[in-house]
Amino acid sequence: MHAPQPITAATGEAGEDRALRYLQARGLAVVSRNYRCKGGEIDLVMRDAAGALVFVEVRARVARSTQRFGGAAASVTPAKQRRLIAAAEDFLARQVEDVPACRFDVIAIDGARIEWMRDAFGVDA
């Protein structure tokens, strides 16, 4: 069994572009892209129609490697979730005066397929 092919920076950026268009078409507005801090990075920070901040992790996999290794969604491990939560806390502390409702979503791109997992994990991860 071969390991999944590594995702290049270009593939990752293309996946993020695709995820952004997908979410915007569903009414979300971009707040920030590729927010980086010492604790980690958030691919997309969006605001939904109700005003909640949505921290989005985009995971892309090439089609031929997805099924054997659990697909893109399976790559958001508990350790990755903790890094995303730390980055979100940093974002909120630096960028937001009044903290709105927040959630963590995952966009999994497996080849041509996009899956949007709303509220994929919480801060107790």
Swiss-Prot record:
<dbReference type="InterPro" id="IPR011335">
    <property type="entry name" value="Restrct_endonuc-II-like"/>
</dbReference>
<dbReference type="GO" id="GO:0003676">
    <property type="term" value="F:nucleic acid binding"/>
</dbReference>
<protein>
    <recommendedName>
        <fullName>UPF0102 protein Rpic_3463</fullName>
    </recommendedName>
</protein>
<comment type="similarity">
    <text>Belongs to the UPF0102 family.</text>
</comment>
<dbReference type="InterPro" id="IPR003509">
    <property type="entry name" value="UPF0102_YraN-like"/>
</dbReference>
<dbReference type="Pfam" id="PF02021">
    <property type="entry name" value="UPF0102"/>
</dbReference>
<dbReference type="InterPro" id="IPR011856">
    <property type="entry name" value="tRNA_endonuc-like_dom_sf"/>
</dbReference>
